[in-house]
């Protein structure tokens, strides 16, 4: 039996307030949410129907010049120098004059980059001590899943979690989000971002988005550039694909006429453009994702897919997944837009508040130590049957 | 208002870090060691992530005629300088470890790498 109303809201109110702080990679997000106290939550598995009200969802991204990734030290500096300003902005937007009214402060405990995680948890601890509010440490992946479930209303979907640092196919079973398949090396977003660096295209708003726009401009969609297709059972590998397409791009820029895939050996005519490479890379990678997702759906006998994570807002991925689901009986794809797909504070608040409402929160500051490695299936999901 | 201070303690040395509010290094929120990394700046990065400037109180001090910073801004400036002091001290220690100048230093490095200083 799950009781989401186990801990009453502060001040005998009829709603909960939570603030979420996210900073596991180059996005710094602060979100404030409100959950009404609903009778149906006293004895039910309705954690995807919290009637959440988003009071503020502020995000600031650390952007580097074209061709460059984000270094931990500089990303941490960005978070350190912006966190107070972003929290103030979120409180103003949420019209919260007295922050001590907030029920719980939620922060990302991991997985992610060490230095940025540290900066954000220090802010969370300070607020907790200053306002005397309990803390909840949230697994970043679980944050994505819970936000996706709440926004889309997907009850028990197979989750495809695709971002710059993670690629996992997940399904819920017996109080855990179990990982059915995952990347064996780099994440899909990392693969796309690093290819964007090779192409030296801008990192704003995000490198993956710019690849998607280039892919849309491909004029040769019926003829894909053949790339390695590396599905290994339920897992996938993307580092080899990246290496291969990087070499093709470099040959293209150097005009290496010896490369017969790119140039006609007799006339020297260019056969492939940068747009073609972007399109083929996307098609190849997304086809791999669709394959393992479909297999996971068959395993758990589910007809719902929920796509979360930054790469999840790629429209082409959503289209391909929808096509697969259409071919299966009554399949549905659930996805969210960039407000919730891309890392944000609201998702941390959502997962953290669910945990808080079931009576789990930090009892001692030693429990707030952040960790770079924190697998999705390590979290006990107390708020689901 | 008492001034912030820090102490480094190791098995072989200790170091005290004190703040001198009259020294210009404790009168800014832009630290020398807490800026964007040189590598990123060389790649043409426009630094838009600087810390905010210290805030002045609304009223100018009637006795001195000099602007006063808010208590919190004073603390931020002092901590920035203190952080610089700590970073420089630790960097110096690391450089010392990186470049042995004689056999005695080399021995020290080996001891450090063995983790013997920690025991």
UniProtKB/Swiss-Prot annotation, chain A:
GO terms for cellular component: cytoplasm; EKC/KEOPS complex; nucleus. The gene is KAE1. The keyword S-adenosyl-L-methionine does not apply. It comes from the Eukaryota. Belongs to the KAE1 / TsaD family. Substrate binds at residues 161-165, 193, 208, 212, 314. Its cofactor is a divalent metal cation. Binds 1 divalent metal cation per subunit. CDD domains: ASKHA_NBD_OSGEP_like_euk. A divalent metal cation binds at residues 140, 144, 161, 343. Component of the EKC/KEOPS complex composed of at least BUD32, CGI121, GON7, KAE1 and PCC1; the whole complex dimerizes. Pfam families: TsaD. InterPro entries: ATPase_NBD, Gcp-like_dom, KAE1/TsaD, Kae1_archaea_euk, Peptidase_M22_CS. Keywords: Activator, Acyltransferase, Cytoplasm, Metal-binding, Nucleus, Transcription, Transcription regulation, Transferase, tRNA processing. Its main location: cytoplasm. One of its GO terms (molecular function) is metal ion binding. Component of the EKC/KEOPS complex that is required for the formation of a threonylcarbamoyl group on adenosine at position 37 (t(6)A37) in tRNAs that read codons beginning with adenine. The complex is probably involved in the transfer of the threonylcarbamoyl moiety of threonylcarbamoyl-AMP (TC-AMP) to the N6 group of A37. KAE1 likely plays a direct catalytic role in this reaction, but requires other protein(s) of the complex to fulfill this activity. The EKC/KEOPS complex also promotes both telomere uncapping and telomere elongation. The keyword Transcription regulation applies. Gene3D superfamilies: 3.30.420.40. This is tRNA N6-adenosine threonylcarbamoyltransferase.
Curated annotation (Swiss-Prot), chain B:
Its main location: nucleus. GO terms for biological process: tRNA processing. Residues 25-36 have a biased composition (Polar residues). One of its GO terms (cellular component) is nucleus. InterPro entries: EKC/KEOPS_Gon7 (IPR014849). It comes from the Eukaryota. Pfam families: Gon7. Residues 1-62, 97-119 are annotated as: Disordered. Transmembrane segments: none annotated. Residues 108-119 have a biased composition (Acidic residues). It is found in: Nucleus; Chromosome, Telomere. Keywords: Activator, Chromosome, Nucleus, Telomere, Transcription, Transcription regulation, tRNA processing. Belongs to the GON7 family. Component of the EKC/KEOPS complex composed of at least BUD32, CGI121, GON7, KAE1 and PCC1; the whole complex dimerizes. Component of the EKC/KEOPS complex that is required for the formation of a threonylcarbamoyl group on adenosine at position 37 (t(6)A37) in tRNAs that read codons beginning with adenine. The complex is probably involved in the transfer of the threonylcarbamoyl moiety of threonylcarbamoyl-AMP (TC-AMP) to the N6 group of A37. GON7 likely plays a supporting role to the catalytic subunit KAE1 in the complex. The EKC/KEOPS complex also promotes both telomere uncapping and telomere elongation. The complex is required for efficient recruitment of transcriptional coactivators. This is EKC/KEOPS complex subunit GON7. It comes from Kluyveromyces lactis (strain ATCC 8585 / CBS 2359 / DSM 70799 / NBRC 1267 / NRRL Y-1140 / WM37) (Yeast). The gene is GON7.
